[in-house]
A protein has these predicted regions:
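Surface-exposed extracellular loop regions of Gram-negative outer-membrane beta-barrel proteins
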Residues: 46-64, 92-109, 227-240, 250-290, ...
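Catalytic toxin/effector domains delivered as secreted proteins or via bacterial secretion systems
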Residues: 881, 892, 896-909, 917-1018
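Beta-strand-dense domains in secreted/periplasmic systems and polymorphic toxin scaffolds
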Residues: 35, 62, 89, 136, ...
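A motif-centric feature for acidic-aromatic and gly/ser/thr-rich catalytic loops and repeats
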Residues: 236-238, 242, 255, 409, ...
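Hydrophobic, gly/ala-rich membrane-insertion helices/peptides used by toxins and envelope proteins
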Residues: 830-834, 839-934, 938
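Bacterial Sec-dependent N-terminal signal peptides
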Residues: 1-28
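Short, well-ordered junction/capping motifs at the entry into regular secondary structure
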Residues: 110-118, 189-193, 267-269, 288-294, ...
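Short turn/helix-capping motifs enriched in Asx and small/polar residues
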Residues: 323, 741-755, 777, 785-787, ...
């Protein structure tokens, strides 16, 4: 009670302080609001933001004071037309002035962006009272020269093939029906043409349901249909291939609901159905997938909760009535440390804590080691601010991992101390020390191991807040510098051991204006050869041709390492692929000429017509057999056999992660996972050789010997204490490995889909996207955490856990078949590389995804108490000021749990899981968020959350009572749709940008104007 009163006084003081700040003068001729964010407890360091408003109350200029590297101000400008509509949105400029007159701003802006004459985005509106956007120009003169995103507002028509739409429905028995085509004029159609003239259509009915999403490849349609029942429940999603072969089992997502509109049954294409059971509080209590149903015992997964709806236990049982035959997988404890009396916790390694700081938080977890009776025990300790200051976790090697964090005033880590012990092994203690600049940006990361402190990385920023350079091991010799274009897209990485140039609308390839990379060049390691690729794409932005060449013009030694996809099916499954490589000591040619045979989205056979093979065991597809069914799958869509690799069986655990790979010659690869999805061990038995690898947090053992300690920038070899660093490209691919002296130890060159076509040295296994490559026994799988990827085929081996976010695409495809511009950090979702700050991105753990934004958990050690790695620099430093309430909920596909995360980015607990589809997906942020802050919807900030079958989750804000939902079309800069509550449903109120600011005078269209209550469910 005493603590609560203290907190109340604190909030009152803050409110008065904020009021006082808003009355201070900045520019006497304009209205403004000043916000001061304190950076230290004494109030001597702070960041000021001043927002100026015109006479109509519209924000038109924002000044971030002294945030640049030169201690200047960063200023943005928003212009409006005579109708009050937002028009030119100017990129920020650097200025020493407290206020910049618009004319002066516009005259100086080009010099901040390489003298580009159009450093602003510009919407064009139609001449109607609806004020709908018909064109949107991105920043940059090149885009204003005819490369806009165009929007046309149409109606469906039976006389036009591109505007025709089949009228699917659901019978009273729940079956799919086809009722011809919709009559002309019954549907609203939005046609979108991107900067490269790629066309897509969205068809919406009078209820606001999206019934068809159509993408065009020339004149060929790729249609995804959404079919609803009379209660507006989404019952079927028909993939594009369904129009070629009407097979629901192979090409449809199917859903069934109970009388309370809860999804109780669903089926993904090519997989068995899943059942879900709820209690009277609408909580998921039982679920069963296809593999569980196929077991003799008929296993179910059960979920238990406490009185506050927090998940307390999850496991498997033999029926859905009682938890008989229980196998507990995970347990969670909250509020206190009474769990210390239980086995596993009742020892001195888990101290008591009587402070009460853990009240309302997760204080401990137990995760079973799958396939055994062993368990991992974890306890979390908090300070008075609710921050995790200590984590203690047992490990499978008979020891413990203890992490202690000291925070700055702004809740960023100042030091993190990690101690690792294991039975009979050397104790390892490491300390990370973080330093920040005057704008609270990360400036330096130091690492201490064995008492010796070194600098892992130094960071420098340009005046626009972008990372300008990074130096490794405290040496200017190991420095990488970064360059950007007017849109903030990375165009160059330059260093003595690795350089890369990326071209979009420039360079020697066909110019691309929609963000796709048209060509790139690079030079790696000690080589003098400049290598490169030119890229072409189809109308769906899928990679077609990657033409290899050398020199800056990519015009010599062409096609030596080209990789071309010559055909896709409508779901994006690769049908034919050609790959070139080295065939002899000085010869190059076609090494793969592949034809894929598919059964639905699943692969059944691959045939290679190439006569030559890769030289000296190089990367290629190995055509091991010639028979009808070379690949087989289980009821969950997991690959169980790959005869071309000589794999006779692959078995999986309850998380759809492999437990064993068995080869026809008796060789095996065994995997051990925790019930939270953490990989703990692999055992390779190849012939007479056995290699055991233990993953104990960031300490890697090989055959019982401590081998590597992974760091934020590379790793330490524990045999000699030497540091090694990764030099990464724009995707986070490890291109070069150098030692602490700057000597090149490894250089890698990649095909676009991830195969290593040439390398020098092979000192460590982390390669493409920074993922561990298992090449033993010719497996050649990359471990993405949630699933494995086969770069020779350009396919994942198992179904995408987030397949329901990508209805139009095969659940086995890699990165929407655009591997140059996207990556899949955990094997669960696709992220645009331009939306990720790769300079600080650790692909083993960093990803922002899901419920609103999801976080991955780095490893078994760092869950609760770990900062949820920033999607971009400065994210957590600003996001707290834009959340509706303290904290947000995030989901981790890697661990299958949902985590609670505070506005400081620290994971604080486990939240209940829900079982209604579709699963949430990745949220994307841009570089602009480093200077503007990201607004986010949260469950904690909402008094109520309801689900719409196609528009997603609606949140009722505690602060204003309005209902918010993410805008799926995002026309006119809109990121959110905002609704007012009425007796009959939700009525459109305003649109808002991604920062939660209302867009002035942006009028509604007839799409989504009103959402009746019957379309919404809990």
């Amino acid at each position: 009670m005493k603590r609560k009163n203290c907190m109340k006084r604190k909030y009152m003081f803050m409110a008065l302080l904020c009021y006082a700040l808003t009355t201070a003068a900045q520019d006497a001729s304009h209205n403004y609001v000043r916000t001061r964010s304190m950076l230290d407890e004494m109030g001597g360091k702070y960041l000021d933001k001043v927002e100026y408003f015109d006479g109509l109350g519209r924000p038109f200029q924002t000044v971030l004071k002294k945030v640049t590297a030169s201690n200047s101000n960063l200023v943005t400008l928003q212009e409006y037309d005579v109708a009050g509509r937002a028009v030119n949105s100017w990129l920020p400029i650097v200025s020493s002035a407290e206020y910049v007159a618009p004319a002066a701003f516009k005259s100086s802006a080009p010099s901040n962006y390489g003298n580009d004459s159009r450093p602003y985005g510009q919407p064009v509106y139609e001449a109607s009272p609806l004020n709908r956007t018909v064109k949107e120009y991105g920043p940059g003169a090149a885009w204003h020269g005819g490369h806009s995103v165009n929007t046309d507002y149409l109606g469906n028509s039976t006389a036009n093939a591109q505007l025709n739409c089949i009228n699917y429905g659901v019978s009273s028995a729940g079956a799919l029906t086809s009722n011809g085509s919709y009559a002309s004029g019954q549907l609203s159609v939005v046609k979108t043409t991107d900067e490269d003239l790629n066309v897509s259509y969205t068809f919406t009915d009078k209820m606001g349901h999206v019934v068809l999403s159509r993408q065009m490849k020339g004149s060929e349609t790729h249609d995804t249909y959404y079919v609803y029942d009379d209660k507006s429940n989404l019952c079927f999603v028909l993939q594009p291939m369904y129009q070629s072969l009407a097979n629901l089992d192979l090409y449809a997502f199917q859903y069934k609901y109970d009388g309370r509109n809860r999804c109780i049954w669903k089926k993904l294409p090519g997989a068995g159905y899943m059942e879900m059971v709820y209690d009277n509080a609408d909580r998921l209590v039982f679920s069963q997938d296809g593999n569980q149903r196929a077991l003799t015992s008929g296993n179910w997964t059960y979920y238990k909760y406490d009185g506050l709806n927090r998940l307390t236990e999850q496991g498997t049982c033999t029926n859905k009535v009682t938890t008989s035959g229980t196998n507990v997988l995970v347990q969670h404890f909250y509020d206190s440390y009474a769990f210390r009396s239980q086995a596993g916790f009742n020892n001195s390694n888990f101290p008591d804590d009587a402070s009460g700081n853990g009240k309302g938080a997760l204080t401990a977890s137990v995760a079973t080691v799958l396939g055994s009776s062993n368990k991992i025990y974890t306890a979390y300790y908090y300070d008075i601010k609710g921050r995790v200051v200590k984590t203690v976790q047992s490990n499978p090697l008979g020891g413990y991992d203890v992490a202690a964090t000291v925070y700055t005033f702004t809740n960023k880590p100042a030091t993190v101390t990690h101690t690792h012990t294991a039975s009979g092994k050397t104790t390892r203690t490491e300390v990370y020390t973080y330093s920040y600049d005057h704008a609270d940006r990360l400036l330096k990361v130091e690492h201490t191991l064995g008492g010796t402190k070194i600098t892992l990385a130094d960071y420098a920023y340009d005046n626009l807040g972008r990372l300008q350079s990074k130096s490794l091991h405290g040496s200017a010799t190991n420095k990488l510098t970064y360059a950007y274009n007017v849109r903030g897209w990375l165009t160059g990485i330059s260093g003595s051991k690795f350089t890369q140039n990326l071209y979009y609308n420039t360079g020697t390839g066909t110019a691309k204006y929609n963000g796709s990379i048209s060509s790139m060049t690079w030079k790696a390691g000690n080589e003098s050869t400049i290598r490169g690729y030119k890229f072409t794409y189809d109308g769906l932005s899928r990679l077609m041709n990657a033409t290899y060449g050398e020199t800056a013009g990519i015009n010599t030694n062409t096609n030596r390492f080209s990789e071309n996809v010559t055909a896709y099916d409508k779901n994006g499954n690769i049908k034919t692929l050609q790959r070139y490589g080295q065939t002899a000591a000085s010869s190059y040619g076609l090494i793969d000429n592949l034809t894929f045979t598919l059964g639905g989205n699943q692969l059944s056979r691959v045939d290679d017509a190439a006569a030559a093979s890769a030289y000296n065991g190089g990367f290629e597809f190995k055509d091991g057999v010639k028979q009808a069914n070379e690949y087989t799958y289980d009821s969950n869509g997991n690959l169980t056999k790959d005869l071309n690799k000589g794999i006779s069986n692959i078995s999986y655990n309850c998380l759809n992660l492999p437990s064993a790979v068995t080869f026809s010659d008796g060789s095996t690869i065994a995997y051990t996972y925790g019930a939270d999805g953490t990989k703990l061990k692999t055992v390779h038995k190849i012939g007479s050789t056995t290699t055991t690898t233990d993953y104990c947090g960031n300490v890697i053992y090989e055959n019982g010997v401590q081998k590597l300690l992974l760091t934020e920038e590379g790793y330490v070899t524990l045999s000699d204490g030497k540091y090694h660093y990764y030099l990464k490209d724009h995707q986070g691919n490890n291109r070069v490995v150098i030692n602490q002296s700057g000597t090149v130890e490894e250089a890698n060159h990649y095909y676009p889909f991830g195969g290593v076509f040439a390398s020098s040295g092979n000192v460590q296994p982390y390669k493409y996207n920074g993922k561990e490559l298992d090449a033993k026994k010719g497996l050649n799988w990359y471990d993405y955490g949630a699933r494995h990827y086969d770069a020779a085929l350009g396919r994942f081996t198992t179904v995408d856990p987030s397949a329901e976010n990508y209805y139009s695409t095969s659940p086995f495809t890699y990165c929407l078949n655009n591997p140059l511009n996207y990556i899949d950090p955990l094997g669960t979702d696709t992220v645009d590389v331009k939306d990720v700050d790769w300079n600080k991105f650790d692909p083993k753990k960093d990803v922002v995804a899901l419920d609103e934004v999801a976080v991955s958990v780095p490893n078994a050690l760092t869950k609760v108490g770990t900062r949820a790695l920033e999607p971009i620099s400065g994210f957590w430093g600003y996001v707290g000021y834009y959340l509706l309430d303290i904290g947000s909920t995030y989901h981790s596909e890697q661990t299958r749990f949902t985590y609670k995360v505070g506005t400081d980015g620290v994971i604080t607990g486990v939240a209940p899981m829900v079982g209604t589809p579709p699963l949430p997906g990745f949220a994307k942020t841009s570089n602009l968020n480093t200077i503007r802050g990201l607004w986010s919807l949260t469950k904690q900030g909402s008094s109520k959350v309801m689900k719409h079958p196609i528009r997603g989750l609606f949140y009722k804000s505690k602060s204003d009572g309005l209902w918010w939902v993410k805008d799926q079309t995002k026309h006119g800069g809109s990121f959110y749709k905002v609704y007012k509550e009425t007796n009959k449903g939700l009525e459109w109120h305003k649109d808002a940008d991604k920062y939660g600011n209302f867009i002035i005078n942006k009028h509604k269209s007839d799409v989504g104007i009103f959402i009746p209550w019957k379309e919404l469910s809990k």
